[in-house]
Amino acid sequence: MKKIIAFGGSTSQTSINKQLATYAAHLVADASVEVLDLNDYSLPLFSVDLEKEGIPQAAHDFYTKIGSADLLVVSLAEHNGAYSAAFKNLLDWTSRINPKNFQNKPMFLMATSPGARGGASVLEMANSRFPYQGAAIVGTFSLPNFYDHMIDGVLRPEYHAQLVECLASMA
């Protein structure tokens, strides 16, 4: 059985990206799913001065979780066209453990937003950048207008079908 680590790149308690990552991860057959909450990995703002004091345990814990996965299912929040500050900070700290902080793990990469572009800018940025950080991108998916297409925890049929097709193409 495949082990999936899923998370949304946001610390929002009602993160739509965490909802999408959780939904997608549970569509993968024969897999156990562990959903991470970025709030469990609170870190001081990265600086080389703080790094001299040592890498915080939360960064090591997150890095270890990534290493335990057979597949990463990640959906990124878009803040002003980029990653959320909390997620970027987590990447910065874990990159000090290993610059390939995604440890060459297969990653299904997604983004969603309340708007029509569905996090397209952050998805493009991550799809370009994450392979340099050791992510083996196996597929991408963008969901526009989250609140119009995810109703009571279920994607509308056309988007559900697209997501299933994207996930199936990974196999």
Task: Give residue spans per PLM region.
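Glycine-rich NAD(P)-binding loop of Rossmann-like domains
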Residues: 102-104, 152-155
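Short alpha-helical linear motifs
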Residues: 43, 109, 128-130, 148, ...
